[in-house]
Amino acid sequence: MKKAFDKAGIPTPKWVAINDKKFNAEEILRILGKPLIVKPAVSGGSLGVGVKNVVNDSNALNIQLDKMFEGFRGWNLVTDGIIAESFIEGPEYTVLIVGSYHQPEFAKIYPPVERVFHPSLPEQEKFLSFDRLWEIYEEESPMPSEENFYEYQLCDPEIQIGIKKIAWDAFAALNGTGYTRVDVRVDKHTGQANVLEVNAQCGISEDENFTSIGAILKYTNQTFTELVIHIINDAFARRKN
């Protein structure tokens, strides 16, 4: 995915692939700067990602990478390697796309929503960590007064067009078809939007408080049933063509 982004000129955090234990933590930090985040190259539901994955020095990086290579509760987190990338501080958005890259005229790019993290969190903890997402709290603490870890709100209209464009460009760079959710972060220091990842055939739900898809449907006044019908109709249309 990252290689495809780079080839197509899609803005994405600077990254390094780690495929075995023969890594050089100091060299990785030299290339990416700090802070950086390490995460499984392929995962789902934030598995393998926690607040300690964001590191600022070589010692913390070594500790976290060793932990990832050990696995988590029997899960192999590094089957497809590890990605280390610059950690982007700033607001996070997610965009739902239904359609096909080679038929943009028939595709639908839904309005982006912003994932707003609890204000008590430090900047380097404002992302979907496994413990907090699934309310396990083995290594991380819950929000004060049992408040929500995050909430969704509609993207600022001033940047909506730009977020939708970069999301579509990332989708097209991967020859996307079907339905996809694209995660984007805007660097609060530079204003540059960066694609974090494209989540192919992402989980879909009508829960507007907990899930991004539910929130997107809420803000577009569309029902979950209508979304499912849209996805099915798109699949049949591609089959005919």
Task: Describe the predicted segments one by one.
Residues 1-90, 101-103:
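Active-site nucleotide/adenylate-binding loops and adjacent lid/helix of ATP-dependent enzymes
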Residues 15, 95, 112, 182-184, ...:
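A structural signal for short, well-ordered beta-strand segments
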